[in-house]
Amino acid sequence: MKYFDIGGVEVSRLGFGCMRFPVIDGDNGKINKKESEKLLLDAIERGLNYIDTAYPYHEETSEDFVGDFLQKHNLCDKVQLATKLPCWLVEKEEDFERLLNIQLEKLQTDYIDFYLLHSLDVKRFRKIVDLGVLDFCKKIKEKGIVKHIGFSFHDEYPVFEEIFNANDWDFCQIQLNYLDIDYQAGMKGYELATKNNVPVIIMEPLKGGRLSNPPEEIREMSKKFEPLSYSQVALKFPLSLPNVMTVLSGMNSHKQVEENCEMAGSVEYNSLTDEEKEFYKVSRQAYKDRERIGCTACEYCMPCTVEINIPKVFSLWNKAFLYDEEEKSKKDYKEYLKDGISPEECIECGKCEDICPQHLEIIKGLKDAHEYLK
């Protein structure tokens, strides 16, 4: 295992994401504790020391499980523990401390190594700033309750810049993989953090497992990298970035632990070959060629006059072709239609097309998407 130094603290370059543990009978709120313990111990024995959990994971049971696990195996002082403030639950200033105390109790600790403001977007961030979150962050760090303060991010790049510049962060966490270099914060966000010497944590390096099971044309191109698996080829992209502190992976099998730890122990910074860079570039184009409409989910088109969730409809349409998920996309579309407005309700007012920064034919796209997904 290779490590990243942040203020004298050695962090493993692979982190264990505690959101996708094995569960019992398909119930996400019932972690299979025996199997999950084995996976964590396997990873720790291979040198992993960064454990990433959060308040809502596994229907609010992940923190409890992690706390029990660390106590049972006497690992509290041997790992770097990360959890996140559930910002969406904050309604008043007192909630910051109340929620943190609940988390400390769940994790059975009196301090947290890495504490993040969870899943920030522009509305959420501005709301908690108005409630005093930045002063709260400063206070808990000064008291030693939290060693490092950061944030995880889910919005467009300009919002990332706003949040990044609002505070003296110790680190930040963004979604990045070889496919999503322009998605959300993307490579621009990584480069901004790097320029300012703020370490970056990477989430979704395999895009929720989709890059582990790529389309046939990408499988064919990947053969040149054998014996590396598709997952390992994908992991090499974020692991090679020199300002990446750790790459998170929600591992639920020993094979995943073994493969991912192997990569985190072998990939050097700035080590991508021209051939690998070309593979990532060609793969991105292969995915783009499968895309049905170039929606970036910026939501400029929202709210729709008749309240159709335009980005949601286009996302399901694209996913069916991007990841060979026709059946799943059609099932998810049926679920959406239970409460959501059907594209059939479109009155063709054209407001969405007037404001779309991608200049998409949204009206036609909605008709085509509905025709395919219904």
Predicted regions and their residues:
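Structural motif
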Residues: 42, 46, 106-107, 167, ...
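Structural motif corresponding to the early beta-alpha repeats
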Residues: 57, 73-93, 118
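A general structural detector for well-ordered alpha-helical segments in enzyme core domains, enriched
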Residues: 2, 35-39, 62-70, 99-103, ...
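Glycine/proline-rich, positively charged
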Residues: 24, 88-206, 214-219, 225-226, ...
